[in-house]
Amino acid sequence: MDYNNNRYGGGGGGSKFNLGHIVGDPFSLATIAIATAGWLIAFVSSIIANIDQEYPNYSWWALAYMFFVILGVTFAVAANAVYTYHVAMVGFLAAGLVFTTSSVNSLIYWSDKAKQAAAAGFILLSMVSIVWIFYFGSQPTASHRQTIDSFALHKDHAPSRASRHMTQSYRPETTHSAQHPQMYNSSQLAGFETSSPVTGYPGGAAGATKRESASAFPPPGQGGNFSNNQQPNPITSQNNPQNQHQQPQDLTSPSTTQQPTEYPYRAKAIYSYEANPDDANEISFNKHEILEVSDVSGRWWQAKKENGETGIAPSNYLILL
């Protein structure tokens, strides 16, 4: 399934900056606040330590680097674009973790209180970096991410319909989309059937003469009525073994009746989904709802709800149980 969902913070990077995404998410609010506090402690302590004695230049670079990392994480969360940039975020955080831990090692053993305070700020930055790497580096379907995201207000809304642009060839055949050819028996055709095999030519079978075509359809002026010797008897046509051999098989016969769909799998909705009103095949479901699934090979799964409603659902909204 195309995995760019607003639910995971994947609005394609085009969402506007909204502080409500941070305020409404306790995890993001707490970690960004701790990271900002740790950076301020390290920055102020570094200035004081640099006045009294020499300060490692490497730690200044670590401070500048982590400043932009915190800004980047804040922007990604506020713009609801975490899923779009989560790979880059994990990479930058991993490099920042190396910088902050190295700064801690170069400052923590000094007797100067300012340098020790700066080391404490870098320790806070290192701890937040580890938490962010574990969170942003995990799949949205991970249990710890689902637990954390359940406290966020904005992550309970229905995502954008970008996932509906999936290739329709992956959609399973349903009763709404499948179209069966209409079949008629000889009694319904009432003389309009032909004994020649149908080849797709508008005049009937290839090589058919004009006389044969004229016998099937009366010429104009006769009102479309058949004479007594031209109109076949429907009962005789049905009882004739030759006509039974030629007439197409009716859809109501047991051999062509569509077998009921089986649902051997069970899936849990990790997020709510609202069906497209223009597509009668889709179904809506709520977060944590249990669905029965018949096929899990494509991007769209044939699913059945507890109330008996059936339809297709995007696979990236479901997780198999």
UniProtKB/Swiss-Prot annotation:
Protein's cellular compartments: Cell membrane
Side of membrane Extracellular, spans: 50-58, 102-116
Record domain SH3: where: 262-321
Residues carrying a glycan: 57
Low complexity composition-biased segments: 238-249
GO biological process: regulation of actin filament polymerization
Stretches of the chain found on the membrane's Cytoplasmic side: 1-28, 80, 138-321
Biased composition (Polar residues): 165-181, 225-237, 250-261
Family: Belongs to the SHO1 family.
Assembly notes: Forms homooligomers.
This protein's name: High osmolarity signaling protein SHO1A
Lineage: Eukaryota, Fungi, Dikarya, Ascomycota, Pezizomycotina
